Amino acid sequence: MVRKVLMICLGNICRSPIAEVVMVDTLEKANVKDVEVDSAAIGGWHVGNRADPRAISTLQKHGLKCTHIVRQIRKQDFSEFDYIFGMDEDNMSELRRLAPKGSKAELLMLGDFGLEKKNRIIEDPYYERGAEGFETAYQQCVVACAAFMKERLQK
């Protein structure tokens, strides 16, 4: 049975593409099969573009490649995916608002896995934090993706 994971952030150019690539890498290194991972945006501003160059650069620094093209979340994602992750409380509120009644997808905050409560929000590095913020988001994703995999996907 294939399980499907969708990473969500506001614009799908910073946090969610990093989380997508990190989750794929985490699963490959653990030899976990039958899991598909994608990412998408809450908003449609960047649809059709690539991830932020700082996100791509951060991933490259860790030997990872990002070829993702931005897309916006769709209603059918809530029935096609098993797990949909937000990066912060605003993402989670929007996901709950957008989710059709009776949706199959479990809505989760990525930082609730493996991170201390005070560090569970994966902050948007787009405006405030330069390259350092992207590295912080990457490191949070590494911890959270590994913890989620161990808790939910390696059973």
Swiss-Prot record:
Which SUPFAM superfamilies does the record cross-reference, listed alphabetically?
A: Phosphotyrosine protein phosphatases I
**Which reactions are catalysed by this chain?**
O-phospho-L-tyrosyl-[protein] + H2O = L-tyrosyl-[protein] + phosphate; a phosphate monoester + H2O = an alcohol + phosphate
Q: Which InterPro entries match?
A: LMW_PTPase, Ptyr_pPase, Ptyr_pPase_sf, Tyr_Pase_low_mol_wt_mml, Tyr_phospatase_low_mol_wt
Which locations, inside or outside the cell, does it occupy? Answer: Cytoplasm
Sorted alphabetically, which keywords does the UniProt record give? Cytoplasm, Hydrolase, Protein phosphatase
Q: Which Gene Ontology cellular-component terms appear in the entry? A: cytoplasm; nucleus
How would you summarize where this protein is expressed among tissues? Cone cells and primary pigment cells in developing pupal retina.
Principal subcellular localisation of the protein: cytoplasm
Pfam families found in the cross-reference section = LMWPc
- Give EC number(s), comma-separated: 3.1.3.48, 3.1.3.2
Q: Which GO terms describe its molecular function?
A: acid phosphatase activity; non-membrane spanning protein tyrosine phosphatase activity; protein tyrosine phosphatase activity
Residues of the active site are C9 (nucleophile), R15, D124 (proton donor)
Q: What does this protein do?
A: Acts on tyrosine phosphorylated proteins, low-MW aryl phosphates and natural and synthetic acyl phosphates.
Tell me the protein family, please.
Answer: Belongs to the low molecular weight phosphotyrosine protein phosphatase family.
Q: What is the protein name for this chain?
A: Low molecular weight phosphotyrosine protein phosphatase 1
Which organism does this sequence originate in?
Answer: Drosophila melanogaster (Fruit fly)
